[in-house]
Amino acid sequence: PATGYYEWPVIDGVKRPHYIALADSPVMLFGGLWETRPDGAGGWLSTYSIVTREADPVIAPVHDRMPLILPPDMHRDWLHGSADEAMAMAHAAPEPALVFHEVDKAVGNVRNQGKQLIAPIPSGTSALFP
């Protein structure tokens, strides 16, 4: 589960971080794929990827792609279904109700932690929508 995710659109030639979250839920679940394979040194390597889709109209000004966000009624089937079922769910998943706001650039440094990283910047608005 995640509470949201970040995108960094370029606005007036400057990358500006935005936090994106569900409008109607404190958590979301992304569709993802994983595999475990030999690492070539006698061990195993576990890898994963978050599935993306074309951005919905709300997020399109921020980025042209977005994670596949699964509604709660699809969680169990995604985790326990077949690859064919996952593909069908990816195409059938509804567009989620999302909100976003610009956040401080401190989010770009992995040493920074805390709730302040998802807080709106003091101006309270995004340059995408003055």
Regions found by a protein language model. Give the residues of each.
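Short linear sequence motif anchored by a di-proline
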Residues: 1-130
